[in-house]
Amino acid sequence: DDRIKVIHKKNGGLSDARNAGMQIMAGTYISYIDSDDWVANDMYEKMMYAIKKNDADICECQFEKTAGIVKSNKEQQTDKVTILKKEEALKAVVEEKINPVVWNKIYKREIVDQLYFEKGKYNEDEFWTYQAVERAEKIVQIEDVGYYYFFREDSIINETYNIRKLDALEARYQRMKYLEKYPEIYGVAKRQLVFNCMYHYQKGLRFLSGSDLKKLKSKVKAIYKDISIDKN
């Protein structure tokens, strides 16, 4: 099948692999699937129907965590959709009503063109998704479970707290700064960031020590200082 393109490259991590694919993308839409996950047979059919019918730029489906056994999702199938305009969608991202992961969505190519993933980040999706949403005029969410996230004990998402997870806090901080042009959403993002700081600080006190703990404390202190002098 000449529609399939195989890229041979040195392993540069998840972001680098996604970026390599984006550099040769040729279709009207793009999606990202992690190699150990899988999708429902009709996921793309349903999402393409929804994105075209509603003239949307992004479509998001529901996902299910699984250890490898998938129950039939017939009882979960529904025609219900949620349609969000740009600012509604940005607020939904901050409130986690739109999940920051990239793999349960499809995107119009034009809105993510040149929007590459930051290399070397632990939570790369957190740095990327809000920017993609900000480029979209309309997002549609469907209620069907279409994506199956393979859950295993040694998954990077479920390992014990470590200093690399501080990337998630940095992503939330960058997101807050990015959203300053949307005053109402900015306030929500700022409050969320305070809670994120508290979470990471508590985790750090429990699991980190030495230079890692010092780094975390310094990061949280810098964010709090920035927030405290912000008059918005």
Residue ranges of each PLM-predicted region?
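Acidic donor-binding segment of Leloir-type glycosyltransferases
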Residues: 1-8, 52
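Membrane-interface aromatic/basic loop that binds lipid-linked glycans or pyrophosphate carriers
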Residues: 207-232
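Short aromatic/hydrophobic "clamp" motif used to bind/position activated sugar donors
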Residues: 30
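Glycine-rich, basic loop-to-helix element that forms the pyrophosphate-binding segment
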Residues: 9-25
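Amphipathic alpha-helical repeat scaffolds of TPR domains
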Residues: 191-203
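General small-molecule cofactor/ligand-binding pocket signal
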Residues: 7, 140-142, 188, 230
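Donor-binding/catalytic cores of nucleotide-activated saccharide
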Residues: 14-15, 35-140, 150-163
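C-terminal, non-catalytic tails of nucleotide-sugar-dependent glycosyltransferases
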Residues: 170-189, 225-231
